[in-house]
Amino acid sequence: MKITGCETLHCGAGWRNFSFLKLQTDDGITGISEYNESYGSKGLTGVIEALVETQIGQNPCNHEAISQQLYAMTRQAPGGINQQAMAAIENAMMDIKGKALGVPVYDLLGGAVRDKMQLYW
């Protein structure tokens, strides 16, 4: 399986915008992640697209090695735009890996912590 490209989607929801990354593979599996470009990180979409371009042809199931490559090629600042872009890419790669293995992503991260959650609206 290899990364072939990405698509970014933006949706206005009235009180905030939602942004999504769709990471595509040659096997037809698409990984999806959400990121936030609404507050202070204008340009995040461009950084995500540029970083994905450097990983075309790589196996997204090797997400840790790819994350290390991205870390090495970018200048890091805590909570900075590069870290936000890398997080969106890594989340999409984890989604791909979970789909390929037929397991939820939380199983890849050590298992579920709870089986229900209280909502406030």
Name the predicted role of every residue range.
Residues L108:
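Active-site-adjacent beta->alpha loops and helix N-cap segments on the catalytic face
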Residues G31, D115-W121:
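Hydrophobic faces of well-ordered beta-strands that scaffold small-molecule active sites
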Residues L101, G111-A112:
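Subtilisin-like serine protease catalytic core
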Residues F18-F20, A88, Q118:
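Broad gene-expression machinery/nucleic-acid interaction feature
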Residues D26-L101:
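Metal- or metallocofactor-binding catalytic centers and their adjacent structured scaffolds
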Residues M1-I32, N36:
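Structured beta-strand/loop patches that form or line metal/cofactor-binding pockets in enzymes
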Residues K2, V113-D115:
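A short, polar/charged loop/turn motif at coil->beta-strand junctions and beta-hairpin connectors
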